[in-house]
């Protein structure tokens, strides 16, 4: 990735040297049979306030519906690294392979079926640099349920907790702290040494809106339907997060 000047709408700490503002970033996306979601994730990446020239998009695809045909036409636009596996792998192993393939010094997760804020990359990089940590994420998540169009907030759990979709980190950390390759969910537990690794918290509104739909690998309806002190229904509406009507219409009934 070549160096390029650029600006972001996020206010950067004045103490940071300008040459450190835009380290090369790899956006990481493991995907499995999510063809209908990927065009909207592309829109989320296009909307990022971080300089496009300083980002690449690394996709690991082990679905039975190969999405190579969807991604090849935009390979140049997104500085794409596409990895195809004919064998379905556990999510822990997929994360590890994405980490190895990434060329950026900072790795930012964007899962295939969620909505990401335009400040997602910029805020993650800013926090990593300003806090001088190797790992950032959010223990609070905002969830949109497509079945009843309600928005909930879950968390916080603890200061070092974060879900993988919210996390960003240095490549050095990722390579030296692999996920358990045998796990099919909750891979962040092994990645963070059971949440003992220091993690700087991000504002969840600057990260993502978790889309809870019928195809989720883990049914998030369990979070909503089981009484919990960390799960709260909000009065927020989808338009508070997604301003573009066409995109909002898709996610509202995804």
Protein language model regions, located:
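The conserved acidic donor/metal-binding loop of glycosyltransferases
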Residues: 111-116
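Acidic donor-binding loop at a coil-to-helix junction in glycosyltransferase catalytic cores
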Residues: 183-191
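Glycine-rich, basic loop-to-helix element that forms the pyrophosphate-binding segment
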Residues: 85-102
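Cell-envelope/extracellular polymer assembly enzymes that use nucleotide-activated donors
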Residues: 23-26, 56, 190
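Conserved donor NDP-sugar-binding/catalytic core segment of glycosyltransferases
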Residues: 119-151
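Acidic donor-binding segment of Leloir-type glycosyltransferases
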Residues: 42-84
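N-proximal low-complexity "stem/linker" segments adjacent to membrane-targeting elements
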Residues: 2-47
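Short aromatic/hydrophobic "clamp" motif used to bind/position activated sugar donors
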Residues: 107
